[in-house]
Curated annotation (Swiss-Prot):
InterPro entries: Ribosomal_bL20, RIBOSOMAL_L20_CS, Ribosomal_protein_bL20_C. Keywords: Ribonucleoprotein, Ribosomal protein, RNA-binding, rRNA-binding. The gene is rplT. This is Large ribosomal subunit protein bL20. The keyword rRNA-binding applies. It comes from the Bacteria. It comes from Mycobacteroides abscessus (strain ATCC 19977 / DSM 44196 / CCUG 20993 / CIP 104536 / JCM 13569 / NCTC 13031 / TMC 1543 / L948). The lineage of its organism: Bacteria, Bacillati, Actinomycetota, Actinomycetes, Mycobacteriales.
Amino acid sequence: MARVKRAVNAQKKRRTILKASKGYRGQRSRLYRKAKEQQLHSLTYAYRDRRARKGEFRKLWIARINAAARANDITYNRFIQGLKIAGVEVDRKNLAELAVSDAAAFTALVEVAKAALPEDVNAPAGEAA
């Protein structure tokens, strides 16, 4: 049987890892073993944070909607409740965009939400006074 030499494969593997770890500080960009370990961590963080990013954006949208809603004398909670009762199906991303870029349209939505809300704050959502 012929002898299998793996020098080329090993060099390619190391080169790939070191290329991917460019930009890391210190030994993590120069030494293969350190670079490999850092690369594993980096990929783990990237995977985790791609999922966390979705929650972060939702928090940002809610903060923007709340600020704009309070400027129109209604809380975020009551605003969303009013929109649901009125049957307005606009997601938080678009509501936040309206709040930032088109104040008049957002104010119109606030008026729709206020009109749909029951007069009595403690009344159930389905029963308008």
